[in-house]
Design a protein with these regions (language model features):
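Conserved AdoMet/S-adenosylmethionine-binding subsite of the radical SAM
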Residues: 107-263, 267-271, 275-276
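Hydrophobic, Leu/Ile/Phe/Ala-enriched alpha-helical segments that form helix-helix packing faces
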Residues: 95, 99, 103, 207-210, ...
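Flexible, acidic/Gly-rich N-terminal and inter-domain linker regions that tether
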Residues: 1-60, 64-68, 72-101
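Short Gly/Ser/Thr- and Asp/Glu-enriched loop/turn motifs at secondary-structure junctions
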Residues: 51, 121-123, 292-296
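Short, acidic Gly/Pro/Ser/Thr-rich loop/turn segments
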Residues: 61-65, 185, 254, 307
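Glycine- and small hydrophobic-enriched segments that form the cores of compact globular domains
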Residues: 79-114, 121-127, 131
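Structured loops at beta-to-helix junctions and adjacent beta-edge loops in soluble globular domains
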Residues: 29, 59, 131, 301-303
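C-terminal accessory regions of radical SAM enzymes
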Residues: 270-313
């Protein structure tokens, strides 16, 4: 498909390009929070204020073509950024300005919480997870540093395919996620459709690396019914390598482009997520600490701590 046509489709879907390879998109939970119809599980679990969250990516390129991804995978088929590389401060400023423009559509909504809308003009949190693989952006440390200077927290999500980049990161995010989509190499290949030949070794190296990072770390399992909700002992062994502060066990949602590759039957119920989380708990030292039925997600920790929820006061 022509890339300009794909770009138009993405813009129609709510994406805004903030540079040559970076973009922003308002999260569904940000929209809901602005009209007081619920908040993201990250607000319940970690204290992130949904209406003040900016969902973005510094790089839309990705080494995987995950079958559960709701994003359109066709736009960037290269593992390198071609052309001009967006500057960190430009990305941040453009994300905020584009998000403000997108939020203006709420001004005519009679249910709009005006206090939240005013606060939303200046995000306090960046979810670096909207699309692509952030570690393909060469100035990721500088981006995180700029966010820190502005008093903005960051949750960074990686697929773990670039362990050397993780190792070389000299500015750590507030919270670092590694996606663990499968318990075995064979299942991973089926679900994530990696482009790199040594994908399993790369993932395992990343898991080992984050065990020593001095920041909040998370292993996230995206559970697809009938495909990867199995081999709990294998999952447990991988989790032990990473020794994360948190484990998120979240159900796959049948939305976006993933509907072309999966069936609604692949979307597990919250009860099934909780049951699977209990099985993971049996083989690890982690316990279910919290859950959110609407998001079909369970949070596991070795023990709950007072600093679980971030303080934004």
């Amino acid at each position: 498909m022509n890339k300009e046509l794909i770009k138009k489709i993405l813009i129609k879907q709510g994406y805004r390009f903030t540079g040559n390879h970076s973009s922003v998109k308002i999260c569904t939970w940000t929209k809901k929070s602005l009209v007081d119809k619920g908040v993201c599980y990250k607000e319940d679990f970690y204290g992130i204020q949904s209406h003040m969250c900016c969902q973005m990516t510094p790089c839309m390129h990705c080494p995987n073509e995950c079958i559960y991804c709701w994003r359109t995978p066709d736009f960037f088929d290269s593992l390198t950024i071609k052309g001009k590389i967006d500057e960190p401060e430009d990305i941040i400023n453009n994300c905020i300005s584009n998000q403000r423009d997108l939020l203006n559509g709420f001004l005519g909504n009679p249910k709009l919480n005006k206090k939240k809308f005013k606060e939303a003009q200046n995000p306090k949190h960046f979810a670096i997870s909207e699309s692509g693989e952030p570690f393909l952006y060469p100035y990721l440390s500088e981006l995180i540093n700029e966010l820190n200077k502005k008093g903005i927290t960051s949750f960074l999500v990686t697929n773990g395919q670039f362990p050397k980049n993780i190792e070389n990161l000299n500015k750590l995010p507030t919270q670092l996620y590694v996606s663990l989509d499968a318990p075995t190499k064979e299942i991973y290949k089926k679900i994530d459709k990696p482009k790199l030949k040594d994908y399993w070794e790369r993932l395992n190296s990343s898991l080992e690396l984050i065990s020593n990072l001095k920041t909040r770390t998370v292993i996230r399992l995206t559970c697809i019914k009938g495909l990867n909700m199995c081999n709990e002992k294998d999952y447990a062994n991988l989790i032990k390598k990473a020794n994360p502060k948190f484990i998120e066990i979240k159900g796959y949602m049948w939305v976006g482009s993933s509907r072309e590759r999966l069936d609604i039957k692949n979307m597990p119920l919250h009860a099934e997520i909780k049951e699977f989380a209990e099985q993971i708990s049996k083989f690890t030292k982690y316990k279910i600490i919290d859950e959110k039925k609407e998001s079909r997600v369970a949070l596991l920790m070795k023990k709950d701590t007072e600093d679980r929820k971030l303080n934004f006061n």
